Amino acid sequence: MEGGGLTKKQIAACIKQMSGKYAPQVVFADWIQCVALSISNSVQIFHDNLWKQREEQYLATMNRYGKEERMKMAEMAGMLILTYEKGLGDVLGEVYMESIGGNKNSGQFFTPYSVSLATARLTLPDTIDENKKLSFCEPTCGSGGMVIAADRYCRKRESIIKGYWMWFVRI
């Protein structure tokens, strides 16, 4: 299984366990937000207004939770890193589906990562000239599994597809 199946299940179990005061999707969103804010602030050299805004946002979110829950969120961040060290995949999408599940009534469906990989293999070219650009579209609006799969495909084909760059456009 891509990206450490056991660790993903552990993260999902933590989210379910922390649910009660807040819905699982709120816990998931708060956790992801705090992880992103932590990473962003940890690599920013200058502590300017943007850094302060992110720090305030982080503290405001974390302060809604008790000490044990905050410790659990930090532990989950560590598990996430371990999961990515085991392999690249749509980890967050799988954690979301495991902990919250899609809501068919509102049209939420999860594309299995194996389908995303197959789509990348079938739609991306085997070779690309150095001067040409490779572009693709993320046809869904979820966790970016198609983009992750396309990146993985390009990395595995690096002997043919050299020095590629990925740009992301939010529409």
PLM regions and their residue ranges:
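Conserved S-adenosyl-L-methionine
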Residues: 113-171
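Short, solvent-exposed secondary-structure capping/transition elements
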Residues: 44-48, 104, 128-132
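A short N-terminal interaction module
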Residues: 1-97
